[in-house]
C-alpha cells in the first residue's frame, strides 16, 4: 500500500549543512543522473517543496531495501521515495550535500539518484573500557559520521581497566578500587538511555559490549570471583538485567575473545539468558566456537577470524586503526572488499572499524588524531556503502598502482579528492591529519644488505641514480606513489608492501624531486615509525628519528628530528604516547627553494621486532604541508626524476 507525506520545509543555510554538490558527494551514490541544472534557494517562498513518498517496494533497489531511497531534484519539487524512515534519513543526508553555495546564494543541483547501501553494517567502535570518552564527544562523532551514512556505534564498555557502565545493584563495581585506569569514570544509566535515544535520532544502531568472560579484571577486583564461577555468573546475569532494562537496543555484544574457557557452560548459558530476554547476541571470532543458530552475529578480528555459513559476520579483521599509519593503510582500507565480497547478503553484514586504547593517550581528541580516525571512517563510509573494492587487504595491500591510468588508482584519487574537499569544508574543527598523496612520487632502491650495521652508508648517499653497482651486484630503483610507504607492513607478509620478500638487516633509500614555484617556508610531515596506539613501545632516543638510524636530507642538508617529549625507558601501557607520531606535533619547518628541491630518505632496518619496539614498521611518511599542518602546499610538483 502506498501513502504520501507532503512536507514543506525550508533548509537553512547553516554550518550543519554540507555544501558539496554532485561532484563531491561522499559516500558516492550507487547511481546519479545529473540534469545539469541548479535551482536557486533565494527565499522561503521559492525554496522547493520536499515530498516524501513512503512506498511498499522499490524494485530499483536490489539489497538492503529498508535503507535505500530514490531522490529526484527538479525545479518545482524535491521527491524522496523510500520504504522506511531509514531510507528517508539517508536521502536527506544526500540532499544536504547537493546544496551548493556561491557567495551568499544557495542552489540545489538537479539530479535523479538511485541509492542504497551495499552492506547493512557500517560502523565504528570506541574502546571506552580502557580509556573513557565523554558523552559529548561520542555524540559529536555519531552525529558527524551519520551524515556520511555510518549507521552503527559499537560501545566497548568494559575492560580490565574499568567497568564504564553504572550499576545501581552493585555500586562497588564503579568504585575507584575496581579500576586500573581513569578510576570512577563511567556512564550513568541515564546517560546510556540518552545516548541510545541520540543514536536513534541519527539513524545509528548502538551495540553495547559487555566483554565476558575475558578482559574482566575490573569485575574480578570488585567481586573477588571469576566470571566463569557459579557466583560470578549469577552476578553477571544481574548486571545484564540492568543492561537490558536500561538500553533499548536489539543487540548485546558479549566479547568471548582472548580467554581460556574453564566453564564450557558459560557462553551458551549467557547467550541463552540474553535471548530469553529478547536480545540478539554478537560475539568475537576467534572466540567461542559456534554453530549456525547458536549466535546471532559474529565479529571477525585478527587474520584467523572466519565467516561461517548461516551466521552473519562483521568484518573487523584488518580494521583496527590503532595499528594504521596515516596514508598507506588508508589505501588498503579503501581498496579492500569487505569480507572479500562486493556486496552484503545474509551472511555478510558489513564492517566496523575498531580503536583499541591499550596504550594510554591523554585527551579524548588526541585519541582521534593519533588514530587518524576521520580519514579512516570516511574511507569505510564509502566502501561499506558503495561496495566493491579491488581486493582484500592481503591482496595488493597498501601500495597504489604506479600507472595513474589504472582504474584502481583513479578510483582512489577520486575518493581522495572528495574526502579532502570535505576535510577543508566540513572538518575544519576536527582532528584530520591528511593531505592528498596521489601526486607524491618516489623512487625507492632495492635494499642493500647492512649485516646489522644500521649506520652503514651506501651509494645513494653520494649520488642519486636510477640504478647502482655495489659489490658486484646491480641495485635498481622503482617508482612508488604515496605520502606514506610501507617497505614491510606491520603484519609482515600478510599484507603486501613495497618489497615482495623483505628481509631484516637491510637498508633502502627513497628519493623525490619537488618543484616549488617560489622560495617558501613550508611544513614537513616526516616519520619513520608509526607508533601503534596499542603497544608499549619506547620513544625514540633524543637526537634520532628512531631506533633504525633513519635519516632525511633536503637539498643535501640533513634534517634533525624534533625534541621528543617522552624519554622513559620502561615498557608500560600506562605511560602515555606523546609526540612520537607526526600527527600530534607541529610540522618540521623547512624552506623550499624556487624550482627543484631534492629529498632523500635513508631507511635502514635491523630485526623486525626489538626490545624497544615490538612491531618494527619498515616504512616512512614524508609530505610537504602548510606551516600550520592544516593543508597541502599549493602548486608543488613531485617527480621521480629532475626535469
Where are these regions (language model features)?
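Acidic, contiguous N-terminal accessory segments
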Residues: 8-113, 283-285, 294, 413-417, ...
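A short beta-strand element within beta-rich, extracytoplasmic domains
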Residues: 518-542
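Short beta-strands within extracellular/lumenal beta-sheet-rich domains
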Residues: 502-515, 584-586
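Active-site neighborhood of glycoside hydrolase catalytic domains
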Residues: 219-297, 301-308
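Beta-strand-rich ligand-recognition modules
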Residues: 537-539, 543-620
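Feature activates predominantly on carbohydrate-active enzymes
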Residues: 22-24, 64-233, 237-251, 269, ...
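Accessory carbohydrate-binding/adhesion or oligomerization-edge regions at the termini
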Residues: 21-41, 413-503, 533, 602-643
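Flexible, acidic glycine-rich loops studded with aromatic residues
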Residues: 302-439
